[in-house]
């Protein structure tokens, strides 16, 4: 896998995320001329053999304009009503703009469960794959008409990253009113440096993410870095670029300022990609330094190295693994229910049968079901022959 930046036309499958503020004017509604210019860019990429998917914000912003809702934060039911109206307007706009290039648009509305529950994830992936096979451009958005505050992606940056990993894209482009990553907010710090290339998302890079989003959108640099962690861990490069100019993709190709995030050099399997990208782990295991060293060496997580079990989860659920520093270092599929995990935490594997009353697995999380997510690891644990088929979702 190359760590060098390539021209957009040299990628195989590209996911493009559009921020609400780019697509919708608070006073006049849809920015039709801008959308037409973007669709011309998409058509140009497709003509060069690139498959393109779009994650488009804007349904709520369009709906609130049509419904003449007041400025400021909306109540949940107001947001859902605005989304119901706006989704129709948004889908029609994309369909009309793409049709001028003889491209068919296909609308897909996702909820959190469509990427977090394995069976629904596979079904959504199959549907998107079929649309691409038929030559369509999938236009994807969160289904805000049914999403609640507690059960939602919350922003389309992370949704776009999950879509990118779902479909095996090799590039994610986040277009917004931000032209890339700076060492500090440039409007607050005149000495802030622009980062053209990010080789790895380290804690220092994460600390550079600041800033709240605009009223029309829910995203910000924080969510873009989160999206980058999901995408790059799965081997997908990411670009953050300004979408303000007409023909924003052509502008990137022409050398406009943007930040490029290099993909992880590690190969990924579809199943492990799903594990790594889970947005809402069901619980967590806090481990000691010795266990962390073992995981980084490609070993399974044994009960002896577990210091604390948090949350309520079942065997096979995705859980976060917290290192000695207190930061998440990995994710994996639980080998035991939370109650059983608490009973055997800190114990030797040989004691499991006596404690639980049956001879369970020796590992709390098997290496075949484990993905390192910390920057210093940032890799997938290699699969072994031992235990293959166990805990496969």
UniProtKB/Swiss-Prot annotation:
Location within or outside the cell: Cytoplasm
Gene3D superfamilies assigned: Acetylglutamate kinase-like, PUA domain
Any single GO BP term: L-proline biosynthetic process
Residue sites binding ATP per the record: 17, 176-177
Keywords assigned: Amino-acid biosynthesis, ATP-binding, Cytoplasm, Kinase, Nucleotide-binding, Proline biosynthesis, Transferase
Gene Ontology molecular function terms on file: ATP binding; glutamate 5-kinase activity; RNA binding
Pathway: Amino-acid biosynthesis; L-proline biosynthesis; L-glutamate 5-semialdehyde from L-glutamate: step 1/2
GO cellular component entries: cytosol
Keyword Endoplasmic reticulum: no
Catalytic reaction(s) noted: L-glutamate + ATP = L-glutamyl 5-phosphate + ADP
Keyword Amino-acid biosynthesis: yes
Predominant localisation class: cytoplasm
UniProt xrefs under Pfam families: AA_kinase (PF00696), PUA (PF01472)
E.C. designation(s): 2.7.2.11
Binding positions (substrate): 57, 144, 156
PROSITE patterns, per database record: GLUTAMATE_5_KINASE, PUA
Ranges for domain PUA: 282-359
Similarity annotation: Belongs to the glutamate 5-kinase family.
Function: Catalyzes the transfer of a phosphate group to glutamate to form L-glutamate 5-phosphate.
Descriptive protein name: Glutamate 5-kinase 1
Record organism: Rhizobium meliloti (strain 1021)
Gene symbol of the encoding locus: proB1
């Amino acid at each position: 896998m190359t760590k060098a930046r390539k021209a957009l036309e040299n990628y195989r499958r590209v996911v493009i995320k559009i921020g609400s503020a780019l697509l919708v004017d608070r006073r006049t509604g849809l920015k039709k001329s801008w959308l037409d210019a973007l669709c011309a860019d998409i058509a140009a990429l497709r003509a060069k053999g690139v498959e393109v998917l779009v994650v488009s914000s804007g349904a709520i912003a369009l709906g609130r304009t049509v419904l003449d809702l007041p400025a400021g934060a909306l109540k949940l039911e107001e947001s859902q009503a605005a989304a119901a109206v706006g989704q129709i307007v948004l889908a029609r706009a994309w369909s009309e703009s793409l049709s001028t290039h003889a491209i068919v648009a296909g609308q897909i509305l996702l909820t959190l469960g469509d990427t977090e529950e394995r069976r629904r994830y596979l079904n959504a992936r199959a549907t998107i794959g079929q649309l691409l096979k038929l030559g369509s451009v999938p236009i994807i958005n969160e289904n805000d008409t049914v999403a609640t505050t507690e059960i939602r992606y919350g922003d389309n940056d992370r949704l776009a990253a999950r879509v990118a990993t779902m479909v095996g894209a090799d590039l994610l482009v986040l277009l917004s009113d931000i032209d890339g990553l700076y060492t500090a907010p440039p409007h607050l710090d005149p000495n802030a440096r622009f980062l053209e290339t990010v080789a790895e998302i380290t804690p220092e890079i994460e600390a550079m993410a600041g800033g709240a989003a605009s009223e029309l959108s829910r995203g910000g640099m924080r969510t873009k870095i989160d999206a980058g962690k999901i995408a790059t861990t799965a081997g997908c490069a990411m670009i953050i670029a300004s979408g303000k100019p007409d023909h924003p993709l052509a502008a990137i190709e022409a050398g406009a300022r943007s930040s490029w995030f290099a993909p992880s050099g590690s190969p990924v399997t579809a199943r492990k990609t799903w594990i790594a990208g889970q947005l809402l782990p069901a619980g967590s295991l806090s481990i000691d330094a010795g266990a962390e060293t073992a995981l980084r060496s490609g070993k399974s997580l044994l009960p002896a190295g577990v210091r604390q079990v948090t949350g309520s989860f079942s065997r096979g659920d995705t859980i976060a693994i917290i290192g000695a520093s207190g930061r998440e270092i990995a994710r994996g599929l639980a080998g035991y229910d939370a109650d059983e995990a608490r009973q055997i935490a800190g114990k030797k594997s040989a004691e499991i049968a006596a404690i639980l009353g049956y001879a369970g697995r020796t590992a709390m999380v098997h290496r075949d079901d484990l993905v390192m997510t910390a920057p210093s690891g940032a890799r997938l644990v290699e699969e072994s022959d031992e235990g293959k088929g166990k805990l496969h979702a």
